[in-house]
Amino acid sequence: MLAVIRIRGRTGIKEDIADTAHLMRLNRINHLVLLNENEVVKGMLQKVKDYVTWGEIDLDTLELLLKNRLLFRGRKHLTEEELKEKTGFTSYRDLAQALIDGKIKPSEIADAVPVIRLNPPKGGYEAIRKSYRSGGSSGYRGSDINQLIRRMIISGVDLNGKREN
């Protein structure tokens, strides 16, 4: 399971790259999508590699992401009881495990919003115009994507940047 995050905006982007990002539903900065790894996805990632960062997400980070940021129809979070009614999974951990094992696709989660919105990373990005290998932020980062996602899930802050009470 790959986590893909858009790190650069739309200004000055070539049309074919913009179309590819749109197909992946990465229309705004700090949006994340979960994708199953295959040859088509790898080709799309290579095309948009200067505008996104991606890597393999682990179970704990995926559970944290789903629990804190996954929205369902009407921009609602679900409790674990409501999650069981909607999806048949008893907990967010079971849902995360099924996604990682490939038992279900992210698009098969009933009424789930396909894009996960994140806050900007605490401490900021490195350099968005440089690749991750060169000390920047864009491109493939492997399992280090988990650290970035954890920096982008700020506890106590909702999706609109307001403090939760």
Curated annotation (Swiss-Prot):
GO terms for cellular component: cytosolic large ribosomal subunit. One of its GO terms (biological process) is translation. InterPro entries: Ribo_uL30_ferredoxin-like_sf, Ribosomal_uL30, Ribosomal_uL30_arc, Ribosomal_uL30_euk_arc, Ribosomal_uL30_ferredoxin-like. The keyword Ribonucleoprotein applies. GO terms for molecular function: RNA binding; structural constituent of ribosome. The keyword Ribonucleoprotein applies. Keywords: Ribonucleoprotein, Ribosomal protein. Part of the 50S ribosomal subunit. Belongs to the universal ribosomal protein uL30 family. This is Large ribosomal subunit protein uL30. The gene is rpl30.
